Amino acid sequence: MKVSVIIPTYNERENLEELFSRIDNALQGLNYEIVVVDDDSPDRTWEKAQELSSKYPVKVIRRTKEKGLSSAVIRGFKEASGDVFVVMDADLQHPPEVIPKLIEAIKNGSDIAIGSRYVKGGKVENWPFYRKLISKGAIMVGRIALPKIRDIKDPVSGFFALRKEVVEGVELNPIGFKILMEILIKGKYSKVVEVPFTFGIRARGESKLKGKTIFEYLRHIYRLMKWEGEIDRIVKFSIVGLSGILVNEGFLWLFVNLGIPKEIAVIPAVELSILNNFFWNDIWTFKDIRRGSIFSRLLKFHIAALSGAVVNFIVYWILLFLGIHYLIANLVGIVLSFGVRYVINRHVTWAT
């Protein structure tokens, strides 16, 4: 088995000698290569990598037109000759000493082995609070928006290994830095394992984190949601929800005109609208991912509806207390309630 260590670089010249030495020590006895994909660094990182190729098994690709970490990794996949690909940064925050553990996980039957900061035994060194908040928030958004990765603790890790078959013939076109998330959604695999590691302190050079990174990440999630069909589901769920409003209002009018008191008539009207919404979501919105009995799904759907109503009520009263107009307060509550109901239904009622 041959291992290809793929390293996208930009202005990492000062780190290469230590990085290559540590990789070499970690992979003693293994057939491996280092594939450096450099975006024409002003500090001539590519040149330093070429110098070190006399000492280590290094293949250097200098890109003068393309830019970006994710596309550099994809180029590395195409140029690599190994059976297993390892992706890592050049800034020494990904410890090369963990690579053998990733490779061992692949040997033991995993298709993808993720170096994880957020499983037991993993951690991040000396990050300020705002960085931790951004990282955890990004992961939470991704896991909610993309059900396929909801059980993965660190789907945005930049340190991972995979069998080459996972990405062979797969069209990858990520936005920004999070190539792993693209692979987890589009790749060909059945088993993923997370290996804990300590995300270290940057040795030298400057962080690549910029303000636009968050925007690119959200664009990437949106694109993956479209690819997965999640945007279509949300649209269908919204249409069904609107039909439920019509059913609710129509039956409320009917029951009141039949002489049922308004205070009582609202109860069967709400229940009929819930049944309407469940029926259409079950045969239309989520028809391809139905699991378990219809009675189990119906019970979970009622729980989601109740949860949404509670959120609507709480948000409404909080905003009223803050002096927000009651119609605006109610609208905000409805929107947040919709989000809660969709998330619960997608991840619980019609979980995949």
From Swiss-Prot:
**Chief subcellular site?**
membrane
How, per the record, is the cofactor bound? Binds 1 divalent metal cation.
SUPFAM superfamilies the UniProt entry points to = Nucleotide-diphospho-sugar transferases (SSF53448)
Residues the entry annotates as binding GDP-alpha-D-mannose = 8, 10, 12, 37, 39, 89-91, 93, 117, 156, 178, 202, 208
Compartment annotation = Cell membrane
Entry GO MF terms: dolichyl-phosphate beta-D-mannosyltransferase activity; metal ion binding
Superkingdom of this protein's organism: Archaea
Gene Ontology cellular-component terms for this entry are: plasma membrane
Give the EC number(s) under which this enzyme is classified: 2.4.1.83
Q: In which pathway does it act?
A: Protein modification; protein glycosylation
Essential cofactor(s): Mg(2+); Mn(2+); Ca(2+)
The membrane topology of this protein is: Multi-pass membrane protein
> Where is Mn(2+) bound in this sequence?
91, 93
Name of this protein: Dolichol-phosphate mannosyltransferase
